[in-house]
């Protein structure tokens, strides 16, 4: 996995630089997501690995309809280097670069029960204040947390769950 990320990083940076230069960051984001999904489809992966398929045909297969010609050329370069297997990682890294550039943090909030809209708004407001940027939130429910919530922003995890508090209490009592 880490090798795939290492291989994908320069492609993601190049894609982001080209897309931003052309003012098409969102279009490339959508195109990369599409291409990564196609490349990870088992049937498409078999077709893409066929020895008679050249890099231009592979790029055409992976490109969404109406894709930017520079994007198609980008896919041709990846296909020519035999790196189509890292497209999923390229797409993920591209999204991180785009979020950083747009000053957006993606936060996953997992709670023991479904959060009420006002509770979610309070959490988002606190996160905006703490990180001084916009927050894109996804929510989830994990009943094993007993109560409270866990907020994961990728770089920072804030664990305010009852489960973790009980675990810490148990650890302090046994030591």
Swiss-Prot record:
A Pfam family recorded for this sequence: OSCP
GO molecular function, one term: proton-transporting ATP synthase activity, rotational mechanism
Presence of keyword Membrane: yes
InterPro entries linked: ATP_synth_OSCP/delta_N_sf (IPR026015), ATPase_OSCP/dsu (IPR000711)
A cellular component annotation (GO) from this entry: proton-transporting ATP synthase complex
SUPFAM superfamilies: N-terminal domain of the delta subunit of the F1F0-ATP synthase (SSF47928)
Record's bilayer topology term: Peripheral membrane protein
Subunit structure and binding partners: F-type ATPases have 2 components, F(1) - the catalytic core - and F(0) - the membrane proton channel. F(1) has five subunits: alpha(3), beta(3), gamma(1), delta(1), epsilon(1). F(0) has three main subunits: a(1), b(2) and c(10-14). The alpha and beta chains form an alternating ring which encloses part of the gamma chain. F(1) is attached to F(0) by a central stalk formed by the gamma and epsilon chains, while a peripheral stalk is formed by the delta and b chains.
Family: Belongs to the ATPase delta chain family.
Official protein name in the record: ATP synthase subunit delta
Originating species: Xylella fastidiosa (strain M12)
Record lineage: Bacteria, Pseudomonadati, Pseudomonadota, Gammaproteobacteria, Lysobacterales
Originating gene: atpH
